[in-house]
Each structure stands twice: as C-alpha cells, then as structure tokens.
Amino acid sequence: MMHKHEAKIIWERKDQPFVDNKYSRAHLWEFDGVKVPASSSPAVLPVPLSSADAIDPEEALVAATSSCHMLFFLAIAAKQGFIVDHYNDQAYGVM
C-alpha cells in the first residue's frame, strides 16, 4: 500500500543579493500546519548564509532514519508481547 507524504518548503529572498551567491539559506518546512525552521548546515555554509538554530537536511535525514528504526522496533516488541517503557537513541550520521 502506497501512502502520500507532503511537505511544503518556503524560502524568500526579500532584500538579499542573490546572483553573488550570498543569500540566506534559511527557510521553513511545513508539515500538517506545523512550521519548522530549516537551513543549510553551518558546516556546509557558515552563518549568516545558514542558520545554526534551524534543522538542516542532513540532521533531518538522521532523525527520520532513527525515528523509523524506533517505530519498527516498538511494533515488533509489541507484536511479540514485550513491554517497552522507554526508548532513547543518540543517532548520528557521517556524510
């Protein structure tokens, strides 16, 4: 069964220069009406071209993978009759 997943990505140039490649990469992700500040990673583009307080795509990929792993683990544990009271994963990715 296929499911449709949607995300809205919002970025505005405002009064920033653009053609010199010195524009902010800060933008918003919107899921189900919730807006999440996002940006390129400061490790890739330094502040002020990126926002250190925002989630970057690399972090989101690591978090999504970890979240999927947790949900899969919890489903298997429940189906096998195990009780899980707590789950904590300090996920990291190297890219």
Regions found by a protein language model. Give the residues of each.
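Extended beta-strand/beta-hairpin segments
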Residues: 1-63, 74-95
